Swiss-Prot record:
A motif (Nuclear export signal) lies at residues 12-21, 85-94. The gene is NS. It comes from Influenza A virus (strain A/Turkey/Oregon/1971 H7N3). It holds the Pfam family Flu_NS2. It is found in: Virion; Host nucleus. Interacts with protein M1. May interact with host nucleoporin RAB/HRB and exportin XPO1/CRM1. It comes from the Viruses. Its main location: virion. Mediates the nuclear export of encapsidated genomic RNAs (ribonucleoproteins, RNPs). Acts as an adapter between viral RNPs complexes and the nuclear export machinery of the cell. Possesses no intrinsic RNA-binding activity, but includes a C-terminal M1-binding domain. This domain is believed to allow recognition of RNPs bound to the protein M1. Average number present in a viral particle is estimated to be 130-200 molecules. This is Nuclear export protein. GO terms for cellular component: host cell nucleus; virion component.
């Protein structure tokens, strides 16, 4: 994984963990958990592309893998919608910057996951 992406994930997660949004903290904790799982999934896909042995095992369980990939794209869309929702409601510049960066990162990660998945198909 690109070191800038790692830093971006860590930075956003750290800043989100310090926030108290007007909405419930459960929603924010859910977003943080989703971000962490997305990072792990993105890392594992990138590593799979690097190792040809994994390519064959992924192809052998293709139906499960495609379903998992579909779920990750749903999670990304949900996170994007949540970031946009928070951006429309907040007037706090710290929150705006954090969620704009989170939105940008989500779009980059979505693109990377698509690229990895096309290489694995």
């Amino acid at each position: 994984m690109d070191s800038n992406t790692i830093t971006s994930f860590q930075d956003i997660l750290q800043r989100m963990s310090k926030m108290q949004l007007e909405s419930s903290s459960v929603d924010l904790n859910g977003m943080i958990t989703q971000f962490e799982r997305l990072k792990i999934y993105r890392d594992s896909l990138g590593e799979s592309v690097m190792r040809m042995g994994d390519l064959h095992s992924l192809q052998s369980r293709n139906a499960t893998w495609r379903e998992e990939l579909s779920q990750k794209f749903e999670e990304i869309r949900w996170l994007i919608a949540e970031c946009r929702n928070i951006l429309t409601k907040t007037e706090n510049s710290f929150e705006q910057i954090t969620f704009l960066q989170a939105l940008q990162l989500l779009l980059e990660v979505e693109s990377e996951i698509r690229t990895f998945s096309f290489q694995l198909i």
